[in-house]
Amino acid sequence: MRVFTATLGTETDTNSPIPTGWRAFEDTMLWRPGQHPDQPTEATGPLWACRRRAREHSWSVVEGTCAYAMPGGPVPQPVYETLRDEILQQLRQALPVDIVALGLHGAMVADRTEDCEGDLLAHVRALVGPEVAVGAELDCHAHLTQRMQDEADVLVFFKEYPHTDYVERGEELLHLLECTRRNDIQPVMHSTPCRMLAAFPTRSEPVRSLVAEMQALEVAPILSVSLVHGFPRADVPDAGAQILVVADRDEALAARVSGELAKRVFAMRRRLRSTRPPMDEAFAQALARPERPLILIDADDNPGSGAAGDSTAVIRLLQAQGVQDACLGPLWDPLAVRFCFDGGVGALLRLRIGGKVGPDSGAPLDVLAEVVALRRDHFQSVGGVHAPLGDCAAIRFGGIEVVLSSVRDQAYDPSLFAGLGLNCAQRRFIVLKSIQQFHLGFDAITPHSVVLRQPPRSAASYTHLPRPMWPLDEDFELP
């Protein structure tokens, strides 16, 4: 088998003021052929599966560009088209191939292309023709469009959130594409909207049992079942949760199973409704809890969902209550980092931190802070892969330690603090800019956490979303 593989993706918050331009890709992942490290990453499961087949089954693998950016605002059209066309030119030079296996996200929006994945897949199909098996592995926080299904033979989405199964899903994709190319199967896909904007954490019920049920259904002729969670921070026509079923030759079966599962997901909607109190109330509850350390999740300022990661709202809560034993990170503020490097370790600086990017960032915070540590090219360790944070500074003021980063990312692992000499396990509160992915590393320190967040967006903030859509609309049923 001769296979071409490449990656192109990001997760777009259509209301974010942060353009996902060249710097965003360079800071996260912009690897040309031959530059991909020898570890799998969340965005390159198909490439990893291809490499294994090259070693074990003598496949011929052509690796294209791998480009992936931290979630942010829409991708400038010239950036998207340049990366897309670079991958297409690499594919053109690799022809003929038997398989094209892509690592995509599913929620990438450019300023003039709402469905980047569908657009890329259409260009790939136009290049390779109908006989080549074309497929993609995607993040479950995706917008599944009909164009994506029309242009691909197989689409496989992560089942787990936090995303721990990207290697397994990459292997699943390659297996199905190989079987397709050998004519052992003829995959057909059918999706059913669940008409929901919701979070589906797979570590807890009721979603844990749903994932197990989906896996149990994957017996021939059912080839693959995915819950596409959707990405609620995007206002696009295909937003919202969906069920995708891939079956061998039997589209009616795929339609029936996806419809049944979609109704089951819709029926659990009230169990998924957030019952978390407002931020101030949740923080008051955290103050009364005995666990030490206790993780406070700054969920509204999670860069992994497209937020800036520069809000100081939780720091203000800590200060208002006189908390003297807390650490927070990462707070994205390249200018403050630069000032810290200018001052050096031990310097006492008047810094204005955070609150720089847009309305959701809130106000900046003026502090008199000691620079306690500096590190060039800091990173977090995520499954053996480095998640870059760029140049970083650790500062301390009023008993609060803050990790300032020059590259925007969410919190994954205690190496965020340890790499700067901070022991977060000894603090009363560990404040993390994350939602779910922090479990990957911080559960080893403590399983106890409190989510701090503001009320969700109102219905008025969506103009392109299909309606009805729960919880924006309450009184309706799925057909």
Regions from the PLM with identified roles:
Residues M1-E56:
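N-terminal amphipathic/basic leader segments beginning at the initiator methionine
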Residues R2-F4, S60-V62, D98-V100, V132-A136, ...:
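Structural motif
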Residues F4, L8-E11, N15-P17, Q77-R84, ...:
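Active-site histidine-anchored catalytic micro-motif
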Residues E56-E63, Q89-V100, A282-L294:
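Glycine-rich phosphate/diphosphate-binding loops that line cofactor/substrate pockets in enzymes
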Residues E63, D85, K263-F266, H378-P479:
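Extended hydrophobic packing segments that form well-structured cores
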Residues T65-E86:
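Charged, often glycine-rich, active-site loop that binds/positions anionic groups
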Residues R181-L210:
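Internal, active-site/partner-interface "lid" segment
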Residues F200-G399, V403:
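Hard-cation-handling environments
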